[in-house]
């Protein structure tokens, strides 16, 4: 009887953890050719609200105009942000606009910089998520040199990258505690990436563990 109770409690805890709303942050660094970027130019906070992921933040030093804004598959920001790999696209679809039914999970469209001052970022997306099998935690957010053509252009790169040009800045997306979200970027509080990018252990812990526990529970009961 005790074993049953323990397993039921363990299963409920795992299910609750898997569905828990996670908040995340990415510190944005200016790309440096061949190097890991070190110049901090902004911060972006991620907040899951129902089925929508909300991104809010600001970045400095961008040229006026629109810049492609994407989630990339890896959290490695080395080599001038090139080590982040391509757009996060686990379903192998063509590049598109944020409101397209077929698009990369990482396709967040464009952000727009003013003629002077910081670039304010306010984006909502219904496809990217901070939890589940296709979580973007531990991946990277990348800001590009040019406007993303949203897959509507005539360039050969339109259907893969939106022809958005080189990578100007990037940052790894990591989970944070509520108290850290209230701090400034100057103090650079710790951001936690609980599992390496591309590691199956993260997906097993959030997606498969409740299923495994349910199987064990059904065998015992």
From Swiss-Prot:
One of its GO terms (molecular function) is copper ion binding. Transmembrane segments: none annotated. Cu cation binds at residues 70, 72, 87, 144. One of its GO terms (biological process) is superoxide metabolic process. The keyword NAD does not apply. PROSITE patterns: SOD_CU_ZN_1 (PS00087), SOD_CU_ZN_2 (PS00332). It comes from the Eukaryota. The keyword Metal-binding applies. Residues 1-19 form the signal peptide. GO terms for cellular component: extracellular space; membrane. InterPro entries: SOD-like_Cu/Zn_dom_sf (IPR036423), SOD_Cu/Zn_/chaperone (IPR024134), SOD_Cu/Zn_BS (IPR018152), SOD_Cu_Zn_dom (IPR001424). Disulfide bonds join 81-170. Its cofactor is Cu cation; Zn(2+). It is an enzyme of class 1 (oxidoreductase). Keywords: Antioxidant, Copper, Disulfide bond, Glycoprotein, Membrane, Metal-binding, Oxidoreductase, Secreted, Signal, Zinc. Protects cells against oxidative stress by converting superoxide radicals to hydrogen peroxide. Oxidative stress is involved in various biological dysfunctions and senescence. Belongs to the Cu-Zn superoxide dismutase family. This is Extracellular superoxide dismutase [Cu-Zn]. The gene is sod-4.
């Amino acid at each position: 009887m005790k074993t049953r109770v323990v397993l039921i409690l363990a299963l409920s805890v795992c299910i609750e953890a898997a569905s828990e709303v996670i908040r995340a942050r990415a510190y944005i660094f200016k790309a440096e050719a061949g190097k890991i970027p070190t110049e901090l130019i902004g911060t972006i906070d991620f907040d899951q609200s129902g089925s929508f992921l909300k991104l809010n933040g600001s970045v400095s030093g961008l040229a006026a105009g629109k810049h492609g804004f994407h989630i990339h598959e890896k959290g490695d920001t080395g080599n001038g942000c090139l080590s982040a790999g391509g757009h996060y696209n686990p379903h192998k679809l063509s590049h598109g606009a944020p409101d397209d039914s077929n698009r990369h999970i990482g396709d967040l469209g464009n952000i727009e910089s003013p003629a002077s001052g910081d670039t304010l970022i306010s984006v909502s997306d219904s496809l990217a998520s901070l939890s589940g099998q296709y979580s973007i935690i531990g991946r990277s957010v990348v800001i590009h040199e040019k406007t993303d053509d949203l897959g509507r252009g005539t360039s050969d790169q339109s259907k893969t990258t939106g022809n958005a040009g080189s990578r100007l800045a990037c940052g790894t997306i990591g989970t944070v505690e509520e108290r850290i979200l209230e701090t400034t970027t100057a103090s650079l509080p710790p951001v936690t990436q609980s599992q390496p990018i591309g590691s199956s252990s993260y997906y097993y812990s959030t997606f498969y563990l409740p299923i495994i526990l349910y199987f064990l529970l059904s065998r015992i009961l």
